[in-house]
Amino acid sequence: MSRTIAAISTAGYGAIGVIKISGNRSKKILEELFKSAGKQRIDSDKWQNKRLYYGTIEQDNRVLDEVMAVYMKAPHTYTREDVVEIYTHGNAVCQRRILDAVIDEGAELAEPGEFTKLAFLNGRIDLTQAEAIIEMINAKSEEAFDLALQGLAGQNERSIGNARVRLQEILVEMAVNIDYPDEDIEEINYQKTIESIEEVIDELDEVIDITRKRRVYRDGIRVAILGKPNAGKSSLLNELLMEDRAIISDIEGTTRDVIEEQILLSGIPITLIDTAGIRESDNVIEKEGIDRSYKAANEADVVVYLIDSTKGPDGEDENVIKRLRADSLVVCFSKSDLPMSAKNKENKGLFDKSIDISIRNKSGMEELKSELRKIAEEKNVAKTEGKRDRTVYEATKAKKSLNEAKKALKKGLSLDFAEVDVKNAYAYLGNITGDTASEEVINKVFERFCLGK
């Protein structure tokens, strides 16, 4: 017998809280706890599908809250099971009491993501849409939300589905020619099969591009701002944030700890990390701050290294840069509105590329932002190449198999060789939608969800 599950679907405090119940006992539980405005129980056959009812939730003759409630009949629900939603006041104590009452009536506490997992298992959505739901919940910008919404609408699902249908047609044609070589059937046309495979590859390229774009707007990058004391790190942080977040002072070593804040650049989330100025120091507290600066820099995707234009780069700057493990380095010369000596101009040429910035007159800021946006896009493309992004990983493997199938067909080899690769590609695409994904993969997708979703 299937479980009836329940959870609080809203987070924290607010005007309204939502208790969600799914399963074949949902309606029965509502009948036991809900009383209409006239203090009457509603008979089972009187509950209307998707109608909102006003009343109270009561247990042991005690009113728990004044609520609105709705019963939604399967299969036209989020989980494709009978679903009940109870709209309570948003106080956490009130919501907890009602959830406890629901559990007392036979429901079980839902696991994180279990409602959406039911939607997947019952065929309402596929794995790509489940991932789009979690991206919508966590979206930090309008661009990220819109891209996730396209995913929920089945953008990748349709593309992958179309690709699998085409591969299935190719496999059927191959199987007939392999299994019945002596029968009076039309011989497979290698060139047409190659063209069909190329069409599938083109479709997969689109899926990969869309997924990479979604990742850029979903994950963004971490940017550590590094440099000597008084190079202008905190001023740069405040300028990018457009608020006075970090203390600015002419006294060296003012910033002793790491400060993290987030901004959006054209919808891309950028985590900015202001660090303590790096120099030789005997001060125990300052040395700890400097160690944390290096740690933050080496864990970041990008380091923006600031050099005071009026002082120019020296051997100490070179030593610091050599210690950095960050993949991307952006060298900026701060205070560019002030005069620079001929020697400093000469030393500046030691760097292949640098950006002159001035917080006072705002120069160079757009160039720096543009560079960070560019790096964010490149970084997230690189990240999707590995197993970290399931869709890109599986689609790339499918492309590789299809290219191997093309090679075999172009060489005129037996269809058996190409068939193996096409079958592999078909299975890889099934892993994306969940049709052939392992239980472990499915569980990992839903582990990312919160309670009540």
Roles of regions detected by a PLM:
Residues R3-A11, E142-L264, S281-N283, G312-K453:
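C-terminal-of-GTPase-core extension/linker across diverse P-loop GTPases
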Residues N24-S26, K73-T77, N91-V93, I125-L127, ...:
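Conserved nucleotide-binding/hydrolysis micro-motifs of P-loop NTPases
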Residues G123, N230, D274:
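Conserved G/P- and acidic residue-centered "switch" motifs that form tight phosphate/ATP-binding loops
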